[in-house]
Amino acid sequence: MKVIFLADVKGKGKKGEIKEMPTGYAQNFLIKKNLAKEATAQAIGELRGKQKSEEKAHAELVAEAQSIKAKLAEEATLVEFTEKVGPDGRTFGSITSKKIAEELQKQFGIKIDKRHIKVDSPIRSIGLIDVPVKIYQDIAGVIRLRVKEG
């Protein structure tokens, strides 16, 4: 019996795969537990349509991520922070990924999740700093910061 997997089943198949399975195993285990459904012509058509729409959505997200990366690469995209500085040259407050995300949204209208901004430790020094950011899956960019004395 041909089945379409609705979820990953260890040793049998992954979600979205169409495979030939023993009839008893398919009916009594896979279909009852909603791990798979019978591969009828209609179900296969639905699966193909769903895969096409997922590919289209993925392509749109990649295009959006590429445009964000291009915006970040422009010379004009320099996120500025004005912080109070102590006598040792370190800022009183630290600049975290949350602050960077908020300033990027406020200054340039670029929305990036703070969890994707890779700050090893909070920034406490003044000057120009490059911070890596993961925009989408394998698309990464760099946010340029200028921290100046206020």
UniProtKB/Swiss-Prot annotation:
One of the GO BP terms on file: translation
GO molecular function, one term: rRNA binding
GO cellular component, one term: ribosome
Keywords recorded for this protein, A-Z: Ribonucleoprotein, Ribosomal protein, RNA-binding, rRNA-binding
Task of the protein: Binds to the 23S rRNA.
Protein family per UniProt: Belongs to the bacterial ribosomal protein bL9 family.
Protein name per the record: Large ribosomal subunit protein bL9
Organism of derivation: Streptococcus sanguinis (strain SK36)
